[in-house]
Amino acid sequence: MGKIVRISGPVVVAEDIENAKMYDVVKVGEMGLIGEIIRIEGNRSTIQVYEDTAGIRPDEKVENTMRPLSVELGPGLLKSIYDGIQRPLDVIKETSGDFIARGLNPPPLDRKKEWDFVPAVKKNDIVYPGQVIGTVQETSLITHRIIVPDGVSGKIKSIYEGKRTVEDVVCTISTEHGDVDVNLMTTWPVRKARRVVRKLPPEIPLVTGQRVIDALFPVAKGGTAAVPGPFGSGKCVSGETPVYLADGKTIKIKDLYSSERKKEDNIVEAGSGEEIIHLKDPIQIYSYVDGTIVRSRSRLLYKGKSSYLVRIETIGGRSVSVTPVHKLFVLTEKGIEEVMASNLKVGDMIAAVAESESEARDCGMSEECVMEAEVYTSLEATFDRVKSIAYEKGDFDVYDLSVPEYGRNFIGGEGLLVLHNTVIQHQLAKWSDANIVVYIGCGERGNEMTEILTTFPELKDPVSGQPLMDRTVLIANTSNMPVAAREASIYTGITIAEYYRDMGYDVALMADSTSRWAEALREISGRLEEMPGEEGYPAYLGRRISEFYERSGRARLVSPEDRFGSITVIGAVSPPGGDISEPVSQNTLRVTRVFWALDASLANRRHFPSINWLNSYSLYTEDLRHWYDENVAKDWGSLRSQAMDILQRESELQEVAQLVGYDAMPEKEKSILDVARIIREDFLQQSAFDEIDSYCSLRKQYLMLKAIMELNSYQSMAIDHGVTMDNLSSLPVREKLSRMKIVPEDQVESYYSSIIKEIHKEYTSFIGEKNAEANI
């Protein structure tokens, strides 16, 4: 039995630990806190503790469990929510309430639940490592395959059928070295990668249904991708702001917050100057979504601090005080745009709810512009003109409602304005063709993790209609949890992903965010008094990041039959200030082969997914070209290249247009700008809230891109024959092309054919049939 000699935050030094080995799990102090040995010098062992060490004293005991940090693998992983060291959060809530009591270590898998085991082999059969000996229907979507452990082969001595718990023996195998019992559950050390026969080249794409990803920047199954995710931007309102509830009543947001805070069923999470209330019963409100006002709900209330507020008053008597970065919907001649409060001007038209049926038409804009913006709804949306804008300085309490599924806004303010709110969308988890999703919330703020924990269980798998959680494992490790557990959460998640890969499944693992993991490494390194590297990160940062990403890949698995599986790792990095030149981003980009550059300016223009096509890249494009040619179309690669060339050319021509003016540009260059706009708005832009547009099959993507390139070809031909863009820009087929994204999958082939015919008909009316045929 060892004893503590030194404590430094999450790092504890103990001496005389019995049989101490690197990465052994130990129980620290009288409370039995879980820790891991990370350094041994003589009789002294350095331990990183995965729980808060407050109150631990020198000379308290340290007990060695004689085993490395491991995870339990078996039926019951799916639909579970764990912390960084695989403690089930739902079980902990029942045991200790809303906060995790120290020293608690409940089993990750339910020991009492019985699973219906169906054997796939029979007595006296010869089995080999990796062979499937039976199955369990884990969820409605996933069949859990029980396989022979690695290194075990022999004859089946006995096998059972029917109801079994995870600890029950389902099979006994006679080997050269004695009998080996196989349970439904096994354990595996998290730092050790599970063995495969060989890694395979990345030749099959992970289809996401997002056009900008699948068409321009694809990721392969078994590939690696990096996504920069900047910190939140604090879009809040003052406490005096009324919120319009679905029952027709209004209540000040500070009073709403106070009343919900008093309810015992709600969970209050407090941080430095911030509080978040996790609501058991969601608040029913209204939101503005795609031009209509709909009933919505919020499960999160936020309270924070701000030194400045912007007071906005309108001609119609409406008013609201918001933080400078808060966005409002502004009606312009081009449509509806989101504008930060600090950028609003007197005279701007901001979205509101009409107080009378006639007010929607009496908002000072032309009827054509209002109709184009689609502001008529059952609640009569309108726009009100800003009369005055004033800045207020002081120490203000500010509040927010989180409304992730309903346009990220709510109706509130004096006179009912549309108030913005933001949250990350998880389209990849919902739509990618991976069988299993493992989501690791590594050091993210509590309110962001709560969004995920409350949103995921309510999402439906779009293919099967079953709950998305039926194929998902969530690992929640918030920023106020001990930093050491952040590192463990990354390894816990990748080990669970490897387990399902070994069954032959395609797994998508999302780590959000690896920057927080790196910050944990930096803090532990500092406590260990190691020589710091760049920006204080340890010198081995690059090696740790590469070791994690190297566990991805598509592989031929250990099995007597041909079985293949893959792990696709998508890691979010959160560089301070969005600076991707810092060490974590650079080391991540060095080992990942896809980079999706999120662009705040695109998000501000309501262009989603807001992936910048000029700064993003995919090194899998050439590897996947053969698959696309064989499974989609022979000219897929050339269409992609044409689209990328046009977008690249547009960025160059925009600088020229700003210097000389659009009207002074040659018609050819006007045409390039025009086609690039069509690609951006009608192809790359995609609505996550539209039932049809939220997912786009590869075939539909191909036909959309083919139609745009066909239009580009005819347009270029027409300009060669002296036709101007003024004549071409008003052709009816262009509007039909813009609607192609909302055409159902079963109608897209006929719709494409009609578009091609109309393009030929309308453009040849300018240049003549013979000229068109000659040029084609």
Curated annotation (Swiss-Prot):
Description of post-translational modifications: This protein undergoes a protein self splicing that involves a post-translational excision of the VDE intervening region (intein) followed by peptide ligation.
A single cellular component GO annotation: plasma membrane
GO molecular function: ATP binding; proton-transporting ATP synthase activity, rotational mechanism; proton-transporting ATPase activity, rotational mechanism
Protein EC: 7.1.2.2
Keyword Cell wall biogenesis/degradation (UniProt): no
SMART domains cross-referenced by the UniProt entry: HintC, HintN
Any one Gene Ontology BP term: proton motive force-driven plasma membrane ATP synthesis
Membrane topology: Peripheral membrane protein
Pfam families hit by this protein: ATP-synt_ab, ATP-synt_ab_N, ATP-synt_ab_Xtn, ATP-synt_VA_C, Intein_splicing
Reactions listed under catalytic activity: ATP + H2O + 4 H(+)(in) = ADP + phosphate + 5 H(+)(out)
Protein's cellular compartments: Cell membrane
Keywords: ATP synthesis, ATP-binding, Autocatalytic cleavage, Cell membrane, Hydrogen ion transport, Ion transport, Membrane, Nucleotide-binding, Protein splicing, Translocase, Transport
Enzyme class (EC, first level): translocase
Keyword GTP-binding part of the UniProt annotation: no
Chief site of localization: membrane
InterPro entries associated with the record: ATP-synt_VA_C, ATP-synth_a_Xtn, ATP_synth_asu-like_sf, ATPase_a/bsu_AS, ATPase_F1/V1/A1_a/bsu_N, ATPase_F1/V1/A1_a/bsu_N_sf, ATPase_F1/V1/A1_a/bsu_nucl-bd, ATPase_F1/V1_b/a_C
Subunit structure: Has multiple subunits with at least A(3), B(3), C, D, E, F, H, I and proteolipid K(x).
HAMAP family assigned: ATP_synth_A_arch
Family listed: Belongs to the ATPase alpha/beta chains family.
Functional summary from the UniProt entry: Component of the A-type ATP synthase that produces ATP from ADP in the presence of a proton gradient across the membrane. The A chain is the catalytic subunit.
Note: The intein interrupts the ATP-binding site.
Protein known as: A-type ATP synthase subunit A
